[in-house]
């Protein structure tokens, strides 16, 4: 997902970081764990043995660079507050939250626990709105999240316009 890609990109550029997320105890989960750790990213979450398999995504790109994603969120939707490593968050300068995971109640609890832990440690919280459809589904909750917790907001123009329900910004 975008959070894993973000931290992998940061690590590839020489930055340090950790990732909190769910993978299944399957081949894709093992490959993900190996690859992200090979970049130097801390990823200590135990694989799950219950529920759906590790997430996958097929990305189709047209010659004019338009893209369509066919995504199965898989095990990552089972992220919950028990998965949040507060020590890892306290050691981080910025905690990055991905809006795509806001659909599940357990993920919301994990987000809030992570944001609380970051602020208690004097750290910053960032949020990616992810896409306009995600914003439309969660507008009121995202507005509250931004007001109460978010120090850095990542969004494109369409996402910001959707969040604040305005024609321009």
Language-model region placement:
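Ribokinase/PfkB-type carbohydrate-kinase core domain
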Residues: 24, 33-48, 52-55, 59-169
């Amino acid at each position: 997902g975008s959070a894993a890609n973000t931290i992998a990109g940061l690590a590839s550029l020489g930055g340090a970081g950790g990732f909190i997320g769910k993978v299944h105890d399957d081949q894709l989960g093992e490959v993900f764990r190996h690859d992200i750790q090979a970049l130097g990213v801390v990823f200590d979450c135990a694989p799950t043995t219950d529920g759906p398999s590790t997430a996958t995504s097929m990305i189709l790109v047209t010659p004019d660079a338009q893209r369509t994603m066919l995504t199965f969120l898989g095990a990552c939707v089972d992220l919950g507050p028990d998965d949040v490593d507060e020590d890892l968050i306290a050691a981080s300068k910025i905690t990055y939250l991905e809006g795509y995971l806001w659909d599940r109640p357990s993920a919301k609890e994990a987000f809030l626990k992570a944001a609380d832990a970051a602020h208690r440690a004097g750290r910053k919280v960032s949020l990616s709105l992810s896409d306009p459809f995600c914003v439309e589904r969660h507008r009121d909750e995202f507005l509250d999240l931004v007001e109460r917790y978010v120090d850095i907001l990542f969004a494109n123009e369409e996402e910001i316009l959707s969040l604040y329900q305005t024609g321009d910004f």
